Amino acid sequence: AVAAALLLSGCRKGNSDSGSMSSSNAMSGSSGSASTTQTGGWKTGLGILTEASDEARTGTIHTIAAAVLLDGDGKLADVMLDELEVEVTADGKGVVTMPTDYRTKRQKGDDYPLAAASSLKKGWAEQADDFADYLTGMTPEQASMLETDKDGKAVDADLLSGCTIRVDQYRDAVAKACTNASALGAAKGDRVSLGVEAENASSDITATDDKDVNAEVDLTVVAL
């Protein structure tokens, strides 16, 4: 079995006020909570989509995170996205192998070889940022209604000119972040930042006839 244990938090420097928001995931073995800190009528939100799945001897933990900043009119002023895929494998003797690289797609940069395969010759972060820029100025409702095709890719020609990756889950994470957003102190001119950190949280990864193994990864997600 594969489990994802989430610790989601956020803060903004220079402000002693604080607020909190929480979310849960229906996928077995995954849950989340989040908190942010801000000021004033602008709002900051953190949205997390996490699923854990296993098939045969391979398990996958997939997390998409979105941080948003809503202006005084309730429109998206800034968006930042990131994505993490963790794959766990097991052999026929019950020994589970955890990954050694827990970097997100944004953190991997050129080590995530999307640019070479992309018709746009653009990496993941560049395309994700183009998608984020496209959403800027929209209301949360408009962003949540972004149309995609059967493969989850955008259908709008302007968006496709800068972003050809699947965006339906990014759209949904942004919508969740908007729902979670709280007016805790952001102001005009602020930008939102997103940090994701993952680490192996499995204590015993060898299965026996009498004992199954839970491969667990701790995730910390921070919106600033």
Task: Identify the residue ranges that each predicted region occupies.
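Bacterial lipoprotein signal-peptidase II cleavage site
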Residues: 11-33
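Active-site- and interface-proximal helix/loop "cap" or "latch" segments in soluble metabolic
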Residues: 38-224
